[in-house]
């Protein structure tokens, strides 16, 4: 029987009490035990940590939906990135200190447009930003992983991150899974899904790591160049191998 894993939405009562997602992660860890207890549970029950990545239009969202249906706990690095910018967080303060008070809007939130204008087309400034944001995301992801492991010490935790290798997070998992898609297939899918022209999609692909670069750093390669049914078969095979 597949165990249902609670997501953020299942903690609405905590949100109503004014607790942020970060607070909830700390609350879970505090209630369920110390770091030493979590480490003990890992050793006793062999929690499996998976890092999942892939390029543009590779099928990461479809893979995540599949893994959730199998009972995996999923951590979305992109969503954690939004938390980093939330008013009052450590990341919020660091970004403002680095890029100036003028990136703050009238609602005291960081104006992503103003921030983007400062880093777009400027590799040095972009690196300056990611050097702040990526470690903060990693910290939040570790909190979430520990929380889920304490709740379900015999389960599977998946960290989904498009920038897994760029950020240096591949060491957070027992296995790294990559979804590989041929560039021509990715372009067709992205154009149909996002309404972008081919040149725009090609530019985005060119800015990412290649399939070969990702595959060289991964433990499990899942190809997604065919039908959705074929993709599900590949995911099922990887899942079964993981749980042998």
What do these predicted ranges mean?
Residues 33-46:
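Short, Lys/Arg-enriched N-terminal segments with co-localized hydrophobic residues
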Residues 45-72, 77-79:
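Walker A (P-loop) phosphate-binding motif
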Residues 79-156:
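ATP-dependent small-molecule kinase phosphotransfer cores
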Residues 141, 170-172, 188-241:
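Small-molecule kinase domains that catalyze NTP-dependent phosphoryl transfer to phosphate-bearing small molecules
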Residues 142-151, 157-192:
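ATP-dependent NMP and nucleoside kinases share a basic, alpha-helical "lid"
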